[in-house]
Amino acid sequence: MADMSSSTTTIEAPADEVRAVLFDIQSYPSWSSAIKSVEVHEKDDQGRPTKLTIKVEAGVLKDRATLSYDWSKAPEEVPFSLDEADMMTEMDGRYLIKDNGDDTTTVTYSLGTSLAMPVPDMMRRKVEMSTIEQTIAQLKQKLEG
């Protein structure tokens, strides 16, 4: 598993609304500027994607990645991992979703990557954190308006 960076925010929306947006992975391109397209290959018995391919553009990183999603800890946690990609050799991530009981939700997004080409660790972490913070901000904007 790749070493992970993470960020946490509180969203002014009930957990069910936050989960509805996060679990609708096919719609990510409509609110996440880093995700350009999503193609679902496999779903579980509840219709949730378990294997999909995304086209991602995060800063200087442009890649196509096939990911596996693990829904066994949903709705509180949804981890994903890389099956294959063009440039990345590893990508692990997860969303932690905590219902605060007051129509707010705390979301933590963690992400770790490794690339096929040599990249200084500091630069890799900077791109990870930029991607995480941008995704969290765009999720918050989508839900809070």
What are these language model-derived features?
Residues 11, 56, 71, 111-113:
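Hydrophobic beta-strand positions in extracellular immunoglobulin-like domains
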Residues 14, 45-47, 74, 100-104:
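Short strand-connecting beta-turns/loops that link adjacent beta-strands
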Residues 29, 39-86, 134-145:
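Glycine-rich portal/gate segments that line the openings of hydrophobic small-molecule binding cavities
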Residues 81-134:
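Beta-strand/loop substructures that line and gate deep hydrophobic ligand-binding cavities in soluble
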